[in-house]
Amino acid sequence: MYRTRPTQLRAFFALKPLYFALSSLLAHNTYAQEPTKIDLAPVAVTGNPLGVGSDELVVPVTVLNGRELSLRRASTLGETLNGIPGVTATQFGPNASRPVIRGLDAERVKIMQNGVGILDVSSLSFDHAVGIDPLIIEQIDVVRGPAALLYGGSAVGGVVNAIDHRIPTEKVGGILGRAEARFGGAENQRNGAAVVDVGNGQFAIHADAYKRKTDYLDIPGFAVSRRKSNADGTPRESRGKLVNSSSEGDGGAIGASLTFDNGYIGTSYSTLNNNYGTVAEESVRIDMKSDRWDVATEFKDLGPVINRVKFRMAHTDYIHKELESGVVGTTFKNRGLEGSFEAGHTPISTSIGNISGVAGLQFNNTTFSALGAEAFVPSVNTQSKALYVYEELPIDAHKITFGARLGHTSVDSSSDAKFGAGQNNGFNTKNLALGGLYSINNNWSLTSNLSHNERAPSYFELYANGAHIATGQFEVGNSRFSKERSNGIDAQIRWKEGKDSFSIGTYYTRFSNFIATFNTINTRGLDGELNPIDADGDGVADGSGKGILPEAQFLAVPAVFKGLEAEGKFNIADNLNLNLRGDYVHATNMRTGDYLPRISPLRLGAGLQYQIGSFNARLDALHAFKQNRTADNELVTDAYTDVSALVAYKLPVKLNIELFAKANNLLNQEIREHASFLKDISTAGERSLLIGVRADF
């Protein structure tokens, strides 16, 4: 049962005036001076230190904002992005879903909030939710492929940056805001959010608040797949409902900044509370809380040598408690500080063009602890610092990009009665990148990017030694790991004419020592006993009476990831647009030739969008093919076709108010994502209808 803490009540009442103010504005909009609404331009903030247009970037970047983001918004960050070319999701039930980019997840996909890491523990375990709620996000940038040069080794697979504008970066004159409410869907969601920015042209204040609640997810059949039941005899008991999948959460923020003609300086405080069922176990819930303080400043047009400086920093206090039948079993804490300072220089003239670029310093200091019976990692302090340089050289209509990064990471564990003496590990890393954009003509262009990437192993890859209940394994790390190395190439051909566009790209990444968990032939008792005797086969050790789990070790193996991505947008008739997309990933262990686990199959998608006046309608279909290229102890995942439809209508009133309805899984298919660890005991929701209203002012 969800229990409201006193701190949550204080946060709610502190933000309550925002709801009344917003309601008043919606009902009596003539009281306020009508402001000028500024729409966000579809320009990537992430992986774009020089602020060029998205079409000029060498690396593939997807930008979601405005209406497009609003229509894609889901309960989790992973599901909001799932279906973008190259992006799937871990989908650990409806409440915990992290983005997977090109088959890579966890410590190889960096998730940021306003350019700074979120510092939660979602990369440690699939049942840990990302500490960002999509209801408040204003823009999401997705960088597909290595971005370690700018963001460190944890971005070797890509970057997801959620931008919420809680620190206003531009001048605000008057009152701007939005509100949104959603009801229904397969989980019977009741969600609402409100955002307000108030300013006098120099000083701006931001406030936002949201609340969400869901019930058990309605599913189109049994939670347990037929393949799993046939393979190991797991009974197919739960039908029509995904047990222990409800959730309840709330949060909000307040921020302020001084804005100038050439920059800003500001700060914000935000809080997030989330209580949800883990699905994997019927009696386990996670009660999460995250408090975050941000400061940010940026100034441009400064002088003849250094023309721009930017500083961002965030401090996060994160805690979540795993409740077993209402009793706290294990408590996870992560407290940390992360930030960056970046300076841009004025263009340097050369015989072939003017070189523009930036130099930066990044730093991170986090302390993680897990206290309780199910802790499988000791307390760890991780510190990192890095220097990087990124440069661009335009040559006529073409461009060359290059850069380097040098860093050091220390990962030090504490002494513990359960895990033994503390250990210290340090890693020196370097990352290099060389890219180019060749403009064939006004419509066609080619891009390519070469990179060498190095990543320090994470604390759980080094020091894990215990039962990981969420994965059903006893995980064993290796403190002797060296840094993970990879080399990659990414190439794309792009076409654009007016609003029509098409791109197709390919990539190849080779890891010399890819770190991942692999099943061994051993078993472990929950107390760590190796190969305990279980004469009667009941899954309980005869001597200790403890449960038994298969052992999984973190190993470093040579591996290759390669794939294709394609996307097109075309106007095929008056007011009618066609969208096409597809992706494919192939990943293997080069030592054995085996396929790597949880790799998404070939996916092809298409969508139609019709808009005339205030009316908008969409029909979308995504087909995921059968995935039979499986790793050891991994079951085949059946194909599915996910069809959805949406209609929206803007009311003829002064405020920009839009009503919308979205139907999901119209074919009522059993949708199981191969990238999900829970794919055989949890399925996506059944055919459902979601309705909502949103307003901008």
How should these model regions be labeled?
Residues 220, 454, 510-512, 517, ...:
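C-terminal beta-signal and adjacent terminal beta-strands/loops
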Residues 245-249, 262-309, 315-338, 373-375, ...:
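Flexible loop and strand-edge segments within Gram-negative outer membrane beta-barrel domains
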Residues 357, 396, 507-511, 532-630, ...:
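Gram-negative outer-membrane beta-barrel transporters
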Residues 117-144:
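Short acidic/polar hinge/loop motifs at secondary-structure boundaries
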Residues 41-70, 98, 106:
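N-terminal periplasmic "start-of-domain" segments of outer-membrane beta-barrel proteins
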Residues 258, 268, 378-511, 571, ...:
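Structural signature of Gram-negative outer-membrane beta-barrels, strongest in the C-terminal barrel
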Residues 173, 177-180, 184-187, 191-288:
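Periplasmic-side early beta-strands and strand-to-turn transitions of outer-membrane beta-barrels
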Residues 244-245, 336-342, 386, 478-482, ...:
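Outer membrane beta-barrel strand-and-loop segments of large Gram-negative receptors
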